[in-house]
Amino acid sequence: MLKKIETGLQDCYIVKPSVFGDDRGYFSPFFIEEDMDKNGLLFDGVIQCNRSKSAKGVVRGLHFQKNPKCQTKLVEVIQGAAIDVVVDIRYGSPTFGKHVAVLLKPYDSKDEESGRQLYVPRGFAHGFVSLEDNTIFQYLIDNDYAPDMEGGILWNDPDLGIDWDGMFHKYGIDKPLTSEKDGKHLTLKKSPKYFEY
């Protein structure tokens, strides 16, 4: 029912749900626990389904929750478009400190890159840049939100090699819109060892 695609990061995958369409539209089961389990995309029970709305140029991240409230996420864009960025911050992982940037946008039968989800396991930092006004993210999480367990890595940490400037230029973003809070996160090198592989 779903297609699992390697991202180059250990344990992090692009997910393509099945889509059944005709001239009236389409139906897509965007989460089936049994299919996820069969593909090794494990959730410790879905606790919440969240949505966020962002203007063009908004950058959020790079966020995670610390143990024991760390979260697995299944992320998709249901309106607009965004580039989703994930960083492996698990010490000892073969892809520690590496990142992937994935274009996410709603399903369009004429666009092979559309309708993708991103499976973000525990031990990864997550963020994105919104490419259009009124971009809406939807994501499932397997642990509840815990403000005192919030963590983050500086979104533009130079050691991570994320080509934010290239993204901004390609999509006509003159100046990213970021929060003061996200600008205060430490770089990965200066951060505590939150996760072990």
Ranges and model annotations:
Residues 1-112, 134, 144-197:
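Non-catalytic, conserved peripheral segments adjacent to functional cores
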Residues 109-115, 124-138:
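Ligand-binding loop in jelly-roll beta-barrel domains
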Residues 141:
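Short strand-turn motif at the edge of the Rossmann-like AdoMet-binding core
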